Regions:
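Mg2+/Mn2+-dependent nuclease catalytic core
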Residues: 52-69
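Conserved catalytic cores of phosphodiester-cleaving nucleases, focusing on short active-site segments
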Residues: 34-36, 42-52
């Protein structure tokens, strides 16, 4: 199991009020990792990333997806710094590509991310 799959499993285990459907899609490149559904009856997608540096790698297809679908899309990044976890809105993907982890996240840490998404 790769680092992003491990991160997804950790996140899923620690957000029990969210229903997740893992998307394994080889025909539509750039589709986020999961389709999620919260207790407020809201669907959203999450792209999970793990980085050991301040840069986050995205494929051109992932960037295009978030540019085309800026609402209810999120990018959740496991980082090596003290906060450990950052959540960004998909609408900010171009800034995230350009600035990396210097870009201010909408949430820092698991508890804040859980509150935002639940």
């Amino acid at each position: 199991m790769g680092p992003e799959a491990k991160f997804y499993n950790y996140f899923k285990k620690n957000t029990p009020n969210i229903s997740y459907t893992r998307i394994e899609n080889t025909s539509s490149l750039g589709t986020p990792d999961v389709l999620a559904y919260n207790k407020n009856n809201v669907f959203f997608t999450i792209e999970f990333k793990v980085t050991k540096s301040k840069k986050v790698r995205f494929s051109p297809h992932q960037i295009a997806f978030h540019v085309k679908h800026p609402i209810n899309t999120f990018i959740c990044i496991k980082t090596p710094d003290a906060c450990g976890l950052r959540l960004y809105e998909g609408s900010r993907i171009r800034e995230l590509v350009a600035c990396g982890l210097e870009l201010e996240a909408c949430c820092l840490g698991l508890a804040a991310c859980r509150l935002k998404l639940e």
